[in-house]
Regions:
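Redox-cofactor binding/interface segments in oxidoreductases and associated redox assembly factors
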Residues: 7-8, 95, 127, 168
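Flexible loop/turn segments at secondary-structure boundaries
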Residues: 13-17, 37-41, 81-83, 100-103, ...
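A conserved FAD-binding loop/helix module that cradles the flavin
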Residues: 14-19, 24, 169-199
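A conserved short coil-to-beta-strand element within the FAD-binding core of flavoproteins
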Residues: 76-89, 96-102
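Cofactor-binding loop segments of dinucleotide-utilizing enzymes, especially the Rossmann-like FAD-
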Residues: 10, 33-37, 171
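Rossmann-like dinucleotide-binding cores of NAD(P)H-dependent redox enzymes
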Residues: 18-81, 200
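FAD-site-proximal beta/loop scaffold in flavoenzymes
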Residues: 1-2, 101-176
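Beta1/beta-strand and adjacent pyrophosphate-binding region of the FAD-binding site
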Residues: 1-11
Length: 200
C-alpha cells in the first residue's frame, strides 16, 4: 500500500503482479519488459495456426491503464541496478534500454543502449521474469529433439524424449504455461520414469 511498485517481467505472472499491486493500493506500478512491444497485427513470420504474437493488454494492464492512464509496460528495457536508502530499503531502480542483436553464434542477445539510463522510484520490486524456452546447450549435448518453438519433443502422457531414458514435462515440454500443468506433468513424468526403471 502506498508504494511505487516495479515488476520485472512481462508475462502472465507479471500481469498477476500488476493486478495484485493495484488491489493492494500501490501508489504506482511499472512493468519492465526486456522484449520489444509486439506488433498490433500478426507479422508474416507468425502465421496461423501459430499462437499470435500480437500486442494485447491483459486484465492487469487494463486495470493499470484505467487508474494511471496508460499501459504500465516499458518495453526493450532491463534493470541495471537496485538502489537503497536509509535502513537498506529499496528506494529506486536504474533501468536502461536494450536492443536485440545477434552475437557471433547467431543468438539474439540484449545489448544495452548507452545514454538511456533512467532512475525510477521503487519501494517494492517483484521479479516475474518470463520463460523463453528450455536451456538448449544441455539438450543439444545429449541429443534431445526439440520442436520449432525450442520445447522438448515428448508426447503428453508418455513424456519420453527422443533419447532413451530421458523424460520431459512442464514448461520444458509444453512451453510457458500454468504451474498446475507443471505439477500434473511432473507427476506423470515421474510415473513414466518409474515404469522405465522398473521395466514395466
Amino acid at each position: 500500500e502506498g508504494k511505487d511498485v516495479v515488476i520485472i517481467g512481462g508475462g502472465d505472472t507479471g500481469t498477476d503482479c500488476v493486478g495484485t499491486a493495484l488491489r493492494q493500493g500501490c501508489r504506482s506500478v511499472t512493468q519492465i519488459e526486456i522484449m520489444a512491444r509486439p506488433p498490433v497485427e500478426r507479422a508474416s513470420d507468425n502465421p496461423w495456426p501459430e499462437w499470435p504474437r500480437v500486442y494485447k493488454m491483459d486484465y492487469g494492464q487494463e486495470e493499470a491503464a484505467a487508474r494511471q492512464g496508460d499501459d504500465p509496460r516499458v518495453y526493450l528495457t532491463t534493470v541495471r541496478k537496485f538502489a537503497g536508502g536509509a535502513g537498506g530499503n529499496l528506494e529506486s531502480i536504474v533501468t536502461v534500454e536494450v536492443k536485440w542483436q545477434r552475437n557471433d553464434k547467431g543468438i539474439a542477445v540484449p545489448v544495452e543502449v548507452p545514454g538511456t539510463e533512467q532512475v525510477r522510484p521503487a519501494q517494492l520490486a517483484l521479479l516475474a521474469m518470463g520463460f523463453l524456452g528450455p536451456e538448449q546447450s544441455l539438450l543439444k549435448d545429449i541429443g534431445v529433439a526439440c520442436d520449432a518453438r525450442s520445447n522438448v519433443q515428448a508426447e503428453y502422457g508418455h513424456y519420453a524424449t527422443s533419447v532413451k531414458g530421458v523424460f520431459s514435462a512442464g514448461d520444458c515440454r509444453r512451453g510457458q504455461s500454468l504451474v498446475v500443468w507443471a505439477i500434473n506433468e511432473g507427476r506423470g513424468a515421474a510415473a513414466a520414469c518409474d515404469r522405465f526403471l522398473s521395466g514395466k
